[in-house]
Amino acid sequence: MLIRGEIMKLLRNISQVFLCCSIASFANAETVKIAIGHQSMCTDTYTAGIVVKELKLLEKYLPTEGKYKDIDFEVSWSDYSSGGPITNQMMANKLNFGVMGDYPLIVNGAKFQATDSLRTKYIAGTGYNLKGSGNAIVVPVASDIYGIDQLKGKDVSVPVGSAAWGMLLKAMQDNNISSSEYGLKNQSPAVGAANIAAGKIDAHGDFCPWSEIMEFRGTGRKIFDGSETNVPYLHGVVVREDFLDEYPEVAVAFVQAVYEAGDWIREDPVRAVDLMEKWTGVEKEVLYIYFSKGGHLTLDPTIKSEWVDALKLNHGVLVTEKSIPPLDFNEWITEDYLKAAYKGLGKDYDAEKSIMNDPAVSNKGLPMEIWHSREGISTYSSMSKFLSAVSEFRATGAKLNSTYVYDKETGLKLFGKTAFFVSTDDGFSTFLRKPDADAFASKTAGMVMDLEGALEVSEKLMKVSSL
């Protein structure tokens, strides 16, 4: 009995030692909260937002060595309808990272620099369109408005503080339309799109992919594309400086996750848009117009000197139109985390930074596409083959998810059903805007029509050629 008692006492002592060690280990473990604000209804944020979130790419790259050995990371994502609320939450120290468009980025940096001690850093991009496509102004599909000059005396809504808001201000400035000559309404993307569908607003300006959502659903029609401003359309990542100072390796990990997200989309755009539709609710056919080969967005985290120039120009637009604090771009923008991330991935940052994609050049000669509901996407090297295929599919009663053509002026990928077709002796050309189509038709003695008209002309030509 004595021996048994001694053994029990020894076991109790050992248990107490292990318990104390476990408590001490738990007490030494630090939990670092990583709070990210993103926008699941803004396509140009996806490589730093929904894709990173759903594929858990940040967790893949988070540091685990050195001072991070005993750290537990708690990653949280908050979804917002535009960039402005993200900045507000960052200022309240409820978010460390923010993903937003060019004008909201500028407001973010300027607001933080206007404080005594708080700062953010612009550490990476997500994607771009060189000429500015992504933002657009849309009217109800039955509207008789076809140009921005027709917006004088009209009511125009936009999410104030968004990238589209900045685009709208710039577009009005460029067309000599003063703020007193139109009514500006602050409406969220969802409200603006609903009002366009109901014909309750004359026009609505919004960021990607809302104009294409309205086009795809048959409720809206573009009258102005952001590419007409000829200013790059950008999104990027800002981080609170106090977080960066304490956990710089986390920012590097975030950039590496952004890079992999871009690779994942490029590897298989159809797979990507199918999953992103499930994650966001945005139709895959709409997402395809952004993320496919020849799509509106070039996924690229690098910060090019041209982007800095564009952001400075955008800041000037806001200074002219609205009261906005100064912004020291040299203090705000840093490539340090990008360079460290690229080095860790074995990539050449300077080489990728030097690459610039212009859709007007790179999209020349790309094939037209038909997305069949069962057979997937087929490509066509000529407009005649494309139109014939559409007619043949329809004759079988097949459901076509979407068709895609390219704007002759900008190289932008368009929905076939919303493009303006011009029929000439040399065949068909397609345009985003009716004024461009009218001008081309005037030069070439052509006729402007929609897809249905083009199909009729194509069928007549085929019958004649078969005689």
Regions found by a protein language model. Give the residues of each.
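Short, glycine-/small- and polar/acidic-enriched structural segments
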Residues: 30-178, 183-185, 202, 231
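Secondary-structure end/capping motifs
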Residues: 43, 245-324
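Pocket-lining segment of extracytoplasmic ligand-binding domains
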Residues: 113, 181-185, 189-278, 384, ...
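Sec/Tat signal peptide C-region and signal peptidase I cleavage site
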Residues: 6-7, 25-29
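A bilobed periplasmic-binding-protein/Venus flytrap-type ligand-binding module shared by bacterial periplasmic
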Residues: 52, 134-145, 233-249, 422-424
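Bacterial N-terminal signal peptides that target proteins for export
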Residues: 3-17
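Conserved C-terminal helix/tail region of periplasmic/extracytoplasmic solute-binding proteins
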Residues: 318-356
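Intrinsically disordered, low-complexity linkers and terminal regions
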Residues: 236, 346-379, 383-467
